Amino acid sequence: MKKKTALLFFIWFLILECLAGCARQGYSCFMEVGDHEISKEEYALLAYDNIARTAREYGAKEGIDVNAPGFWEQKRDGVSPMDRVRELTDGEAVHQKGIQILAKENGMIDEIGYEAFLKQYQEENKQRKQMKEEGKVLYGPLELSVSQYYSYRQSQLEQALEEFAEQKIVTIREEELKAYYPVVKQAEEKKNFQAKLSLVIFEDAGEEQKAAAEQWIAAHGITDDLPLLLAEETGISASVESMAVDTLELGKENLLLDRVVQAVQEVEAGEVTPAIEYTDGMSAVAVVESKEYAAFGSYDTERDYVEYLLREKKAREYIADEISRLEVKKGKAWETLTYEDIIK
Protein backbone atom coordinates (compact mmCIF):
# COMPACT_ATOMS: atom_id res chain seq x y z
CA MET A 1 0.00 0.00 0.00
CA LYS A 2 2.84 2.34 0.90
CA LYS A 3 4.54 1.58 -2.44
CA LYS A 4 1.29 2.31 -4.32
CA THR A 5 0.81 5.57 -2.40
CA ALA A 6 4.40 6.59 -3.06
CA LEU A 7 4.00 5.81 -6.78
CA LEU A 8 0.80 7.85 -7.02
CA PHE A 9 2.46 10.73 -5.19
CA PHE A 10 5.40 10.60 -7.61
CA ILE A 11 3.10 10.62 -10.65
CA TRP A 12 1.16 13.60 -9.27
CA PHE A 13 4.44 15.37 -8.56
CA LEU A 14 5.52 14.93 -12.21
CA ILE A 15 2.16 16.21 -13.46
CA LEU A 16 2.27 19.26 -11.21
CA GLU A 17 5.88 19.96 -12.16
CA CYS A 18 4.99 19.87 -15.88
CA LEU A 19 2.08 22.22 -15.29
CA ALA A 20 4.28 24.50 -13.22
CA GLY A 21 6.82 24.63 -16.02
CA CYS A 22 4.19 26.20 -18.24
CA ALA A 23 2.56 28.36 -15.58
CA ARG A 24 5.63 29.44 -13.64
CA GLN A 25 5.47 32.94 -15.07
CA GLY A 26 1.70 33.17 -14.72
CA TYR A 27 1.05 32.87 -18.47
CA SER A 28 -0.44 30.10 -20.58
CA CYS A 29 1.79 27.32 -21.87
CA PHE A 30 2.16 27.97 -25.58
CA MET A 31 5.58 27.37 -27.16
CA GLU A 32 9.05 26.54 -25.92
CA VAL A 33 12.32 27.51 -27.57
CA GLY A 34 15.41 25.97 -26.05
CA ASP A 35 13.59 25.28 -22.75
CA HIS A 36 12.36 28.89 -22.54
CA GLU A 37 8.68 29.68 -22.88
CA ILE A 38 7.02 31.92 -25.42
CA SER A 39 3.74 32.84 -23.78
CA LYS A 40 0.50 33.21 -25.72
CA GLU A 41 0.66 36.95 -24.97
CA GLU A 42 4.12 37.38 -26.48
CA TYR A 43 3.21 35.26 -29.51
CA ALA A 44 0.00 37.26 -30.04
CA LEU A 45 2.04 40.47 -29.98
CA LEU A 46 4.13 39.15 -32.88
CA ALA A 47 1.11 37.72 -34.69
CA TYR A 48 -0.87 40.97 -34.70
CA ASP A 49 0.62 42.37 -37.93
CA ASN A 50 0.17 38.98 -39.62
CA ILE A 51 -3.59 39.24 -39.13
CA ALA A 52 -3.67 42.20 -41.53
CA ARG A 53 -1.22 40.53 -43.92
CA THR A 54 -3.28 37.33 -44.03
CA ALA A 55 -6.50 39.29 -44.53
CA ARG A 56 -4.91 41.06 -47.53
CA GLU A 57 -3.75 37.75 -49.01
CA TYR A 58 -7.17 36.13 -48.74
CA GLY A 59 -9.02 39.33 -49.62
CA ALA A 60 -7.20 39.42 -52.95
CA LYS A 61 -8.71 36.05 -53.86
CA GLU A 62 -12.00 36.13 -55.72
CA GLY A 63 -15.14 35.40 -53.72
CA ILE A 64 -13.59 35.48 -50.24
CA ASP A 65 -15.08 37.84 -47.65
CA VAL A 66 -12.56 38.29 -44.83
CA ASN A 67 -15.28 39.84 -42.64
CA ALA A 68 -17.60 36.84 -42.91
CA PRO A 69 -18.34 34.90 -39.69
CA GLY A 70 -16.02 31.91 -39.30
CA PHE A 71 -13.55 33.23 -41.90
CA TRP A 72 -10.46 32.74 -39.72
CA GLU A 73 -11.13 29.07 -38.95
CA GLN A 74 -12.58 27.98 -42.30
CA LYS A 75 -10.17 25.69 -44.12
CA ARG A 76 -9.54 26.01 -47.84
CA ASP A 77 -7.42 23.27 -49.39
CA GLY A 78 -6.76 22.04 -45.87
CA VAL A 79 -5.42 25.37 -44.57
CA SER A 80 -7.30 28.01 -42.57
CA PRO A 81 -6.38 31.71 -42.36
CA MET A 82 -5.33 31.11 -38.73
CA ASP A 83 -2.99 28.36 -39.96
CA ARG A 84 -1.44 30.97 -42.23
CA VAL A 85 -1.10 33.44 -39.34
CA ARG A 86 0.71 30.78 -37.29
CA GLU A 87 2.95 29.94 -40.24
CA LEU A 88 3.97 33.59 -40.65
CA THR A 89 4.49 34.12 -36.92
CA ASP A 90 6.38 30.96 -35.92
CA GLY A 91 9.71 31.91 -37.50
CA GLU A 92 9.62 35.43 -36.07
CA ALA A 93 8.69 34.14 -32.61
CA VAL A 94 11.58 31.66 -32.59
CA HIS A 95 14.00 34.33 -33.84
CA GLN A 96 12.99 36.89 -31.22
CA LYS A 97 13.08 34.39 -28.35
CA GLY A 98 16.41 33.10 -29.67
CA ILE A 99 17.82 36.64 -29.48
CA GLN A 100 16.65 36.87 -25.88
CA ILE A 101 18.17 33.49 -24.99
CA LEU A 102 21.56 34.32 -26.52
CA ALA A 103 21.55 37.74 -24.84
CA LYS A 104 20.86 36.08 -21.48
CA GLU A 105 23.54 33.43 -22.00
CA ASN A 106 26.07 36.17 -22.72
CA GLY A 107 25.16 38.26 -19.68
CA MET A 108 23.31 41.08 -21.44
CA ILE A 109 19.99 40.57 -19.64
CA ASP A 110 18.87 38.63 -16.58
CA GLU A 111 15.26 37.71 -17.35
CA ILE A 112 13.57 36.83 -20.65
CA GLY A 113 10.05 35.92 -19.55
CA TYR A 114 7.09 37.99 -20.73
CA GLU A 115 6.24 38.99 -17.17
CA ALA A 116 9.73 40.47 -16.75
CA PHE A 117 9.33 42.26 -20.09
CA LEU A 118 6.08 43.89 -18.92
CA LYS A 119 7.81 45.17 -15.78
CA GLN A 120 10.55 46.70 -17.95
CA TYR A 121 7.88 48.22 -20.19
CA GLN A 122 6.10 49.84 -17.26
CA GLU A 123 9.39 51.15 -15.89
CA GLU A 124 10.28 52.64 -19.29
CA ASN A 125 7.02 54.60 -19.46
CA LYS A 126 7.45 55.70 -15.85
CA GLN A 127 10.91 57.07 -16.69
CA ARG A 128 9.61 58.80 -19.82
CA LYS A 129 6.90 60.53 -17.81
CA GLN A 130 9.47 61.64 -15.23
CA MET A 131 11.77 63.00 -17.97
CA LYS A 132 8.87 65.02 -19.35
CA GLU A 133 8.06 66.47 -15.94
CA GLU A 134 11.73 67.42 -15.42
CA GLY A 135 11.89 69.17 -18.79
CA LYS A 136 14.44 66.75 -20.24
CA VAL A 137 14.64 65.96 -23.97
CA LEU A 138 12.33 63.04 -24.75
CA TYR A 139 12.59 61.17 -28.04
CA GLY A 140 9.44 59.54 -29.35
CA PRO A 141 5.99 59.50 -27.73
CA LEU A 142 5.43 60.22 -24.05
CA GLU A 143 4.04 56.73 -23.57
CA LEU A 144 5.11 53.74 -25.65
CA SER A 145 2.67 50.98 -26.51
CA VAL A 146 3.57 47.39 -25.59
CA SER A 147 4.26 46.67 -29.26
CA GLN A 148 6.48 49.74 -29.67
CA TYR A 149 8.55 48.91 -26.60
CA TYR A 150 8.88 45.24 -27.63
CA SER A 151 10.19 46.22 -31.07
CA TYR A 152 12.56 48.79 -29.56
CA ARG A 153 13.92 46.40 -26.93
CA GLN A 154 14.38 43.52 -29.37
CA SER A 155 16.16 45.79 -31.85
CA GLN A 156 18.52 46.99 -29.11
CA LEU A 157 19.18 43.43 -27.95
CA GLU A 158 19.90 42.18 -31.46
CA GLN A 159 22.27 45.06 -32.16
CA ALA A 160 24.12 44.49 -28.88
CA LEU A 161 24.33 40.77 -29.60
CA GLU A 162 25.74 41.39 -33.07
CA GLU A 163 28.38 43.73 -31.65
CA PHE A 164 29.28 41.15 -28.98
CA ALA A 165 29.65 38.42 -31.60
CA GLU A 166 31.73 40.69 -33.86
CA GLN A 167 34.16 41.44 -31.04
CA LYS A 168 34.20 38.21 -29.00
CA ILE A 169 33.15 35.36 -31.29
CA VAL A 170 34.06 36.09 -34.90
CA THR A 171 37.59 35.46 -36.12
CA ILE A 172 38.78 36.46 -39.59
CA ARG A 173 41.86 35.37 -41.50
CA GLU A 174 43.62 37.60 -44.00
CA GLU A 175 42.81 35.15 -46.79
CA GLU A 176 39.09 35.51 -46.00
CA LEU A 177 39.34 39.29 -46.25
CA LYS A 178 41.06 39.12 -49.61
CA ALA A 179 38.46 36.68 -50.90
CA TYR A 180 35.61 38.92 -49.68
CA TYR A 181 37.04 42.13 -51.15
CA PRO A 182 35.71 41.50 -54.73
CA VAL A 183 32.22 40.86 -53.32
CA VAL A 184 32.25 44.18 -51.46
CA LYS A 185 33.79 46.00 -54.42
CA GLN A 186 31.03 44.87 -56.78
CA ALA A 187 28.26 45.77 -54.33
CA GLU A 188 29.71 49.18 -53.43
CA GLU A 189 30.35 50.23 -57.01
CA LYS A 190 26.76 49.40 -57.86
CA LYS A 191 25.47 51.24 -54.79
CA ASN A 192 27.34 54.54 -55.05
CA PHE A 193 26.85 56.83 -58.02
CA GLN A 194 26.53 60.38 -59.30
CA ALA A 195 23.45 61.14 -61.36
CA LYS A 196 21.75 64.07 -63.05
CA LEU A 197 17.98 63.84 -63.08
CA SER A 198 14.87 65.58 -64.28
CA LEU A 199 11.94 65.24 -61.91
CA VAL A 200 8.48 65.46 -63.45
CA ILE A 201 6.19 66.47 -60.57
CA PHE A 202 2.41 66.07 -60.67
CA GLU A 203 -0.57 65.75 -58.36
CA ASP A 204 -1.13 62.23 -57.05
CA ALA A 205 -4.54 61.11 -58.33
CA GLY A 206 -4.13 57.35 -58.04
CA GLU A 207 -2.24 54.41 -59.52
CA GLU A 208 -3.74 54.65 -63.02
CA GLN A 209 -2.64 58.26 -63.38
CA LYS A 210 0.87 57.48 -62.12
CA ALA A 211 1.17 54.60 -64.59
CA ALA A 212 -0.01 56.86 -67.43
CA ALA A 213 2.58 59.49 -66.50
CA GLU A 214 5.37 56.90 -66.34
CA GLN A 215 4.47 55.49 -69.77
CA TRP A 216 4.15 58.88 -71.46
CA ILE A 217 7.43 60.21 -70.05
CA ALA A 218 9.28 56.99 -70.95
CA ALA A 219 8.01 57.28 -74.52
CA HIS A 220 8.62 61.03 -75.05
CA GLY A 221 11.50 61.91 -72.73
CA ILE A 222 12.25 65.36 -71.33
CA THR A 223 11.60 68.36 -73.59
CA ASP A 224 11.01 72.05 -72.94
CA ASP A 225 7.33 71.70 -73.78
CA LEU A 226 6.79 68.52 -71.71
CA PRO A 227 4.27 70.11 -69.29
CA LEU A 228 2.14 71.36 -72.19
CA LEU A 229 2.25 68.10 -74.18
CA LEU A 230 1.65 65.92 -71.12
CA ALA A 231 -1.41 67.99 -70.18
CA GLU A 232 -2.79 67.92 -73.74
CA GLU A 233 -2.37 64.16 -74.23
CA THR A 234 -3.07 62.78 -70.75
CA GLY A 235 -4.75 65.59 -68.82
CA ILE A 236 -1.96 65.52 -66.23
CA SER A 237 -0.63 68.90 -65.09
CA ALA A 238 3.07 68.74 -64.25
CA SER A 239 6.21 70.77 -63.64
CA VAL A 240 9.86 69.81 -64.21
CA GLU A 241 12.79 70.28 -61.84
CA SER A 242 16.47 69.33 -62.18
CA MET A 243 18.30 67.42 -59.46
CA ALA A 244 21.86 66.17 -58.98
CA VAL A 245 22.55 63.20 -56.69
CA ASP A 246 25.89 62.03 -55.28
CA THR A 247 25.39 59.10 -52.91
CA LEU A 248 28.85 59.57 -51.39
CA GLU A 249 27.90 63.03 -50.17
CA LEU A 250 24.48 62.34 -48.71
CA GLY A 251 24.12 64.28 -45.48
CA LYS A 252 21.25 64.57 -43.06
CA GLU A 253 18.26 62.30 -43.37
CA ASN A 254 16.06 63.45 -46.23
CA LEU A 255 13.12 61.19 -47.01
CA LEU A 256 12.58 62.62 -50.48
CA LEU A 257 16.24 62.22 -51.41
CA ASP A 258 16.23 58.70 -49.95
CA ARG A 259 13.26 57.78 -52.15
CA VAL A 260 14.92 59.29 -55.22
CA VAL A 261 18.19 57.44 -54.59
CA GLN A 262 16.38 54.15 -54.06
CA ALA A 263 14.43 54.57 -57.30
CA VAL A 264 17.45 55.67 -59.36
CA GLN A 265 19.52 52.78 -58.01
CA GLU A 266 17.35 50.38 -60.00
CA VAL A 267 17.66 52.10 -63.41
CA GLU A 268 20.35 53.29 -65.79
CA ALA A 269 20.97 56.48 -67.77
CA GLY A 270 18.17 57.23 -70.22
CA GLU A 271 15.59 55.29 -68.22
CA VAL A 272 12.61 56.42 -66.18
CA THR A 273 11.92 55.48 -62.56
CA PRO A 274 8.54 54.38 -61.25
CA ALA A 275 6.55 57.21 -59.67
CA ILE A 276 7.65 58.08 -56.14
CA GLU A 277 6.05 60.16 -53.40
CA TYR A 278 7.37 63.72 -53.77
CA THR A 279 5.51 65.61 -51.05
CA ASP A 280 2.08 65.15 -49.51
CA GLY A 281 -0.37 64.78 -52.37
CA MET A 282 2.31 65.01 -55.06
CA SER A 283 4.19 62.35 -57.02
CA ALA A 284 7.27 62.51 -59.24
CA VAL A 285 8.87 60.48 -62.00
CA ALA A 286 12.64 60.77 -62.34
CA VAL A 287 14.26 60.72 -65.77
CA VAL A 288 17.92 59.72 -65.43
CA GLU A 289 19.90 62.01 -67.73
CA SER A 290 23.30 60.60 -66.72
CA LYS A 291 24.64 58.15 -64.15
CA GLU A 292 28.23 57.32 -63.25
CA TYR A 293 29.23 54.75 -60.68
CA ALA A 294 31.87 55.63 -58.08
CA ALA A 295 35.05 53.57 -58.18
CA PHE A 296 35.83 51.49 -55.08
CA GLY A 297 39.30 51.75 -53.56
CA SER A 298 42.03 49.13 -53.58
CA TYR A 299 42.21 46.31 -51.07
CA ASP A 300 44.84 48.15 -49.04
CA THR A 301 42.82 51.36 -48.77
CA GLU A 302 39.48 49.65 -48.10
CA ARG A 303 40.70 46.75 -45.93
CA ASP A 304 39.18 48.08 -42.68
CA TYR A 305 35.79 48.62 -44.31
CA VAL A 306 35.84 45.14 -45.84
CA GLU A 307 36.70 43.66 -42.44
CA TYR A 308 33.85 45.59 -40.81
CA LEU A 309 31.35 44.21 -43.33
CA LEU A 310 32.68 40.66 -43.07
CA ARG A 311 32.58 40.74 -39.27
CA GLU A 312 28.99 41.96 -39.41
CA LYS A 313 28.06 39.21 -41.88
CA LYS A 314 29.72 36.43 -39.87
CA ALA A 315 28.20 37.70 -36.61
CA ARG A 316 24.71 37.53 -38.10
CA GLU A 317 25.41 34.06 -39.49
CA TYR A 318 26.64 32.94 -36.07
CA ILE A 319 23.48 34.22 -34.37
CA ALA A 320 21.23 32.59 -36.98
CA ASP A 321 23.11 29.30 -36.63
CA GLU A 322 22.85 29.35 -32.83
CA ILE A 323 19.12 30.03 -33.00
CA SER A 324 18.61 27.24 -35.54
CA ARG A 325 20.06 24.76 -33.01
CA LEU A 326 17.41 25.56 -30.40
CA GLU A 327 14.73 22.91 -29.98
CA VAL A 328 11.21 24.20 -30.59
CA LYS A 329 8.13 22.67 -28.95
CA LYS A 330 4.51 23.70 -29.44
CA GLY A 331 1.85 23.22 -26.79
CA LYS A 332 -1.83 22.46 -27.24
CA ALA A 333 -2.63 26.16 -26.79
CA TRP A 334 -0.67 26.91 -29.98
CA GLU A 335 -3.09 24.78 -31.99
CA THR A 336 -6.14 26.50 -30.48
CA LEU A 337 -4.97 30.10 -30.92
CA THR A 338 -7.87 32.21 -32.20
CA TYR A 339 -8.31 35.50 -33.98
CA GLU A 340 -9.77 36.93 -30.77
CA ASP A 341 -6.67 35.89 -28.79
CA ILE A 342 -4.55 38.08 -31.05
CA ILE A 343 -6.64 41.22 -31.44
CA LYS A 344 -7.94 41.53 -27.86
Locations of regions flagged by a protein language model:
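A C-terminal, polar beta->alpha supersecondary segment
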Residues: 28, 33, 44, 76, ...
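FKBP-type peptidyl-prolyl cis-trans isomerase
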Residues: 27-61, 97-103, 153-161, 177-181, ...
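Sec-exported extracytoplasmic/periplasmic mature domains
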Residues: 48-56, 90-109, 119-134, 153-166, ...
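Positively charged n-region of N-terminal signal peptides that target proteins for export
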Residues: 1-8
